[in-house]
Amino acid sequence: GGIVCGILTLIGDMGKGFLPVFLCLQLRDTALAAPLLKIDQKIWGEVPEWVAMIGMTFVLLAPVLGHIFPLYRHFQGGKGIATTFGCLLGFAPNLFPALILAFFFILFSLVIRITPHFYRTIATYLCAMGIFFIWGETTEQKLGFFLISVVVCLRMHMSGEHRETCKVRLLWMH
């Protein structure tokens, strides 16, 4: 492995989350969207807002589900953290969703140290989900991140790895 492999893996995992979300947001209000989604607006008329919202929610969720439960590895995948960041970065130039998740990961890694990683990840996603419901901009962001959080927390809970006791230490306490 090494650092180069790690960086390339991180870029790839984030990219597979970023690309579908970013492209969906760029294309959904354009003339290209109807043919790509096979919607004939002459027959069906305007796409209802709730259909677009549900579609965007699944576009947010799909890369994370695919990373955590890949078919080709018998549903045994990764934790979905980098892919979640990629999905949230897909909302660019609105970086609020990704910054909230990053804030809590940094907070629980450096200031309020929660160990092991299992508990830190669950605390991060639960706190970020609370902030999303208060200050999230769109229903699709809120619903998408809620579902991602549920899937990531379930994945963490279902992992068969040995769990040490949760330890919480403050930065200034050793």
For the regions a language model picked out, list residue spans one by one.
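Generic alpha-helix detector with strongest preference for long hydrophobic helices that associate
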Residues: 5, 39-46, 50-56, 66, ...
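Canonical bilayer-spanning transmembrane alpha-helix
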Residues: 116-144, 150
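Alpha-helical transmembrane segments in multi-pass membrane proteins
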Residues: 12, 16, 20, 24, ...
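Helix-coil boundary and interhelical linker segments in multi-pass alpha-helical membrane proteins
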Residues: 22-58, 89-98, 133-144
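Interfacial segments of multi-pass membrane proteins
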Residues: 1-2, 81-114, 126-136
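Residue-level signal for alpha-helical transmembrane segments in multi-pass membrane proteins
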Residues: 22-23, 110, 130-134, 151-158
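Interhelical loop and helix-boundary elements at the membrane-water interface
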Residues: 1-18, 33-36, 47, 67-83, ...
